[in-house]
């Protein structure tokens, strides 16, 4: 960048750097020589004014800039940058030379690492992985898909849970083969216990089956009854709808019939009430007639008999008084005429009185 300066092998002195010890050789040799017995006081500034004036300003500026570049290059770098530089250098060497001898040695010295963890068993450490044959692998993965599991460990857990009894039997057999006669005796007892438990379980199952069968039968019967009821109701509804379709004025007819029946009942009630009123009026009139006869001094057996006698005689006397035609037989009319002949004055007077 800047032109180099020829100094004949001597370092130039920079006044801006205080710790620089480089000076001209004559001055240094004169101070450091052991033969010199004279002690000279170190001057505050070793160069004379004539020497400094001889240098140009451009020379000093160039020297100052060169020293700044050296200082910037000697700055301590971080280890991270230093490692990066080393890696770049190695890559460049590989690109140029290919595979170096150092790389080959490093490959030979590195050992193979087992990435998968192992399990300690009775026969030593074993790998967790296992290889399955093609047929068994297909069956296994088919079962896993049927169960809907994501991992193979879950399917194996399911298989273990379903084969607990067989695993127990295997353990017992292994223990019996290792133990001897005592274990065989224990096995027999355990077998007997298992058989008794099986019998109890079978009995319970039969009971539950019978009870469930009975409940099913009762439910079926109830359903049949309900069906029959619904069928009968449906038939009745169909019959009613058919009648209404065939005779649409049936409802009006029924209403008319009911109204007629009600009218007849009202008429019968009115007739009964009128009859009772007539009887009461007759009794009242008879009482009044007896009072009038007593007042006039006319006492006759016919009047007393007509008042306190039979109902037929009372009816005939009242009919004669009121002048009504009675639908009785001839004997009643004859009795009335006889009574009138016996007492013509009383009958005449009573009739006139009543008419009046």
Swiss-Prot record:
PROSITE patterns: R (PS51370), TCP (PS51369)
Predominant subcellular localization, coarse grouping: nucleus
GO BP: regulation of DNA-templated transcription; regulation of secondary shoot formation
Tissue expression: Expressed in axillary buds, and, to a lower extent, in axillary structures such as flowers and siliques.
Bias (Basic and acidic residues) ranges: 173-198
Induction line: Repressed transiently after shoot apical meristem (SAM) decapitation (release from apical dominance).
GO CC annotation, single: nucleus
Domain R as annotated: residue spans: 216-233
InterPro entries tied to this protein: CYC/TB1_R_domain, TF_TCP_subgr, Transcription_factor_TCP
This protein's UniProt keywords: Developmental protein, DNA-binding, Nucleus, Transcription, Transcription regulation
Domain TCP intervals: 112-170
Taxonomy, superkingdom: Eukaryota
GO molecular function: DNA binding; DNA-binding transcription factor activity
Record localization: Nucleus
KO phenotype (gene knockout): Increased shoot branching but reduced response to strigolactone (e.g. GR24). The triple mutant brc1 brc2 abcb19 is insensitive to GR24 treatment but is partially restored with regard to shoot branching.
Region (Disordered): 173-226
Disulfide bonds: none
Function: Transcription factor that prevents axillary bud outgrowth. May also delay early axillary bud development. Probably involved in the auxin-induced control of apical dominance.
Name assigned to this protein: Transcription factor TCP12
Organism: Arabidopsis thaliana
Upper classification of the organism: Eukaryota, Viridiplantae, Streptophyta, Embryophyta, Tracheophyta
């Amino acid at each position: 960048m800047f032109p180099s300066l020829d100094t004949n092998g001597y370092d130039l002195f920079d006044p801006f750097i205080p710790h620089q010890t480089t000076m001209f050789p004559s001055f240094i040799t004169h101070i450091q020589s052991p033969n010199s017995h004279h002690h000279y006081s170190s001057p505050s500034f070793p160069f004379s004014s004539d020497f400094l004036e001889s240098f140009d300003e451009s020379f000093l500026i160039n020297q100052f800039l060169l020293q700044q570049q050296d200082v910037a290059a000697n700055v301590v770098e971080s280890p991270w940058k230093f490692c990066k530089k080393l890696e770049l250098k190695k890559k460049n060497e590989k690109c140029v030379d290919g595979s170096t001898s150092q790389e080959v040695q490093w490959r030979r010295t590195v050992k193979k690492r087992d990435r998968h963890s192992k399990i300690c068993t009775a026969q030593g450490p074993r790998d967790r992985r296992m290889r399955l044959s093609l047929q068994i692998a297909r069956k296994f993965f088919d079962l896993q898909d049927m169960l809907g599991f994501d991992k193979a460990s879950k399917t194996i857990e399911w298989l273990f849970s379903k084969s607990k009894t067989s695993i127990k039997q295997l353990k017992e057999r292994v223990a019996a083969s290792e133990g001897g006669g005592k274990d065989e005796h224990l096995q027999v007892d355990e077998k007997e216990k298992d058989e008794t438990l099986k019998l109890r379980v079978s009995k319970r199952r039969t009971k539950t089956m019978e009870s469930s069968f009975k409940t099913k039968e009762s439910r079926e019967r109830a359903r049949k009854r309900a069906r029959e009821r619904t069928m009968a109701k449906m038939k009745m509804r169909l019959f009613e709808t058919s009648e209404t379709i065939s005779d649409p004025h049936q409802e009006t007819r029924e209403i008319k019939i009911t109204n007629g029946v009600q009218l007849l009942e009202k008429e019968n009630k009115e007739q009964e009430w009128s009859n009772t009123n007539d009887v009461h009026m007759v009794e009242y009139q008879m009482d009044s007639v007896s009072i009038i006869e007593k007042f006039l001094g006319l006492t006759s057996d016919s009047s007393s008999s007509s008042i306190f006698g039979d109902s037929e005689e009372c009816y005939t006397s009242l009919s004669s008084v009121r002048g009504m035609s009675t639908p009785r037989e001839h004997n009643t009319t004859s009795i009335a005429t006889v009574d009138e002949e016996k007492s013509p004055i009383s009958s005449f007077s009573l009739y006139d009185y009543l008419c009046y």
